[in-house]
Every structure is written in structure tokens, then in C-alpha cells.
């Protein structure tokens, strides 16, 4: 990233962080400081192994997602509902996504390993996601933001099923989801506390937060630990990966 581009991206990511902090919590948006063991409140406007599936050069096909909580329907009524969902996510409560254009600034492109690593490090340097509670709404906001600002097709942000630590399925994305225990007093701070909505979004009922892990640039942990979640791309016999998914209670087709 060049100097001018970095400044522009920095302003854009600051808007992203503010929007994420407001999502499903308004003044209760917050994050967990794991190193200090304290919950921090932020007010609005605050400051590789063998047989690995290739993550680069993949051809994008509409609706071809893994476990992202949303997808891109081809056309018709589903397409209309999808567009309305995106509009609701961006414009809910008359709270516009700061600085995000209606259409992508650049041509759409698939996420690549290098791009994912670069964006991950930049987000970490700017304090973008680290320690922030995860929710499906924040997931979608991040997808929308990357699509509109960077032209990145929203099919890349996928994590292992859990329970426990959820590792990114896209090799190069350096943000994993880590379960945290939230004190009852913090959970009851307000009706839509991000910690409460995170647990309700998760099929295992765990409260998750984003955590930066630079080792994920060199270790494809999601594939090495849970190859069955990659289905036909795992290199495992079909009967084997389906049996493993069934044993873990993970639906498959």
C-alpha cells in the first residue's frame, strides 16, 4: 500500500471500527481485553501441509460459499431479499456505514492469500478487530465493507465449526475467533450487549471474539485440524469426511 492509499485506508478502517462497535449494542459496543482480563467500553467515535486446497486463483461462482451466514442468490425474489438485507445491515437505525460507497470503488475480485495477509496486518496495526466481540451482524458488516471499499467478493470470511477456537478457512486471513467467559455483571449491562448477541449467534452458545494470530500466515490450522470441513477439497475419501462431519453434528450435502 502506498502512502496516500494507506492514509485513505486508515480513515476507512476507522469508520469500519466505529460501525462495528455500534452494531447490536449502540452505546454498549465493546471489546474484551484478554491480556488484562478486563472488559473495555468504547463510546461512539472512539479514537502449510501436503494436499492443501488452493486458496488462490479460485474462480468465483455465485452462491458458492462455505459457512458464511449469508450468500448471494442468483436472481428473482431471493436476490431482492438479499439486497434488502444488505441495505438493512448498512442503514439500520439510520446509521450509515461511514464512508462506504453504494457500489464498489474498484472492480470485484476474489480474495487472495497476499491480500488477506496484508489486510489482516493493517487491521491489526489500526486496532480494527482485536478483542472485539463477534456476531453475525458484524460479520456481514465486515463483508460489506471489504466488498465496497476493496472490491473483495464476500465469500472468504469462513471459520471452522467449533466448539472452541474457530480458525479461518481462508489461508491468509489471520483473525481467528476465540471463546471468552464474560462475567454476568458485564452481560447484563444492557439489553443488546454484544457478548449476549454473540452467544445467541453461535450454534454452540459460546461468546466469541476476534483475535489476531500471525502464525496463521504460515500454518493452515483450519485444514490441518479439521480437513473434513473442506469436504471434497480435503483429499479424504468421501465416506471418511462425511462420517467425521456427522460425528461432530455438522450438516453436509
Swiss-Prot record:
Gene Ontology cellular component list: host cell plasma membrane; membrane
Membrane topology designation: Lipid-anchor
Motif range (PxxP): 104-107
Compartments where located: Host cell membrane
GO MF annotation: an example: GTP binding
Keywords in alphabetical order: AIDS, Host cell membrane, Host membrane, Host-virus interaction, Lipoprotein, Membrane, Myristate, Viral immunoevasion, Virulence
Region described as Acidic: spans on this chain: 88-95
Lipidation feature positions (N-myristoyl glycine): 2
Main subcellular localisation: host cell
Region annotation Mediates dimerization: where it falls in the sequence: 140-156
Lipoprotein found in the keyword field: yes
Entry similarity comment: Belongs to the lentivirus primate group Nef protein family.
Domain notes: The N-terminal domain is composed of the N-myristoyl glycine and of a cluster of positively charged amino acids. It is required for inner plasma membrane targeting of Nef and virion incorporation, and thereby for infectivity.
Subunit and interaction comment: Homodimer. Interacts with host CD247/TCRZ; this interaction induces down-regulation of cell surface TCR/CD3 complexes.
Described purpose of this protein according to its UniProt entry: Factor of infectivity and pathogenicity, required for optimal virus replication. Alters numerous pathways of T-lymphocyte function and down-regulates immunity surface molecules in order to evade host defense and increase viral infectivity. Alters the functionality of other immunity cells, like dendritic cells, monocytes/macrophages and NK cells. One of the earliest and most abundantly expressed viral proteins.
Name assigned to this protein: Protein Nef
Source organism: Human immunodeficiency virus type 2 subtype A (isolate KR) (HIV-2)
Gene this chain is encoded by: nef
Amino acid at each position: 500500500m502506498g502512502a496516500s492509499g494507506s492514509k485513505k485506508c486508515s480513515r476507512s478502517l476507522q469508520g469500519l471500527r466505529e460501525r462495528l462497535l455500534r452494531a447490536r449494542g449502540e452505546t454498549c459496543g465493546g471489546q474484551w481485553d484478554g491480556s488484562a482480563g478486563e472488559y473495555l467500553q468504547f463510546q461512539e467515535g472512539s479514537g502449510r501441509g501436503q494436499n492443501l486446497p488452493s486458496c488462490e486463483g479460485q474462480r468465483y461462482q455465485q452462491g458458492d460459499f462455505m459457512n458464511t451466514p449469508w450468500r448471494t442468490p442468483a436472481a428473482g425474489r431471493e436476490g431482492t431479499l438479499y439486497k434488502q438485507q444488505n441495505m438493512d445491515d448498512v442503514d439500520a437505525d439510520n446509521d450509515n456505514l461511514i464512508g462506504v460507497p453504494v457500489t464498489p470503488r474498484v472492480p470485484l475480485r476474489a480474495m487472495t492469500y497476499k491480500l488477506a495477509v496484508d489486510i489482516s496486518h493493517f487491521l491489526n496495526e489500526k486496532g480494527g478487530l482485536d478483542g472485539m466481540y463477534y456476531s453475525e451482524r458484524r460479520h456481514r458488516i465486515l463483508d460489506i465493507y471489504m466488498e465496497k471499499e476493496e472490491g473483495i467478493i464476500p465469500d472468504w470470511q469462513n471459520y471452522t465449526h467449533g466448539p472452541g477456537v474457530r480458525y479461518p478457512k481462508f489461508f491468509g486471513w489471520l483473525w481467528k475467533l476465540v471463546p471468552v467467559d464474560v462475567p454476568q455483571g458485564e452481560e447484563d449491562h444492557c439489553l443488546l450487549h454484544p457478548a449476549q448477541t454473540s452467544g445467541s449467534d453461535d450454534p454452540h452458545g459460546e461468546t466469541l471474539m476476534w483475535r489476531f494470530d500471525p502464525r496463521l500466515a504460515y500454518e493452515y490450522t483450519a485444514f490441518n485440524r479439521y480437513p473434513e470441513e473442506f469436504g471434497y477439497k480435503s483429499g479424504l475419501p468421501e465416506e471418511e469426511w462425511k462420517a467425521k462431519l456427522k460425528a461432530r453434528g455438522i450438516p453436509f450435502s
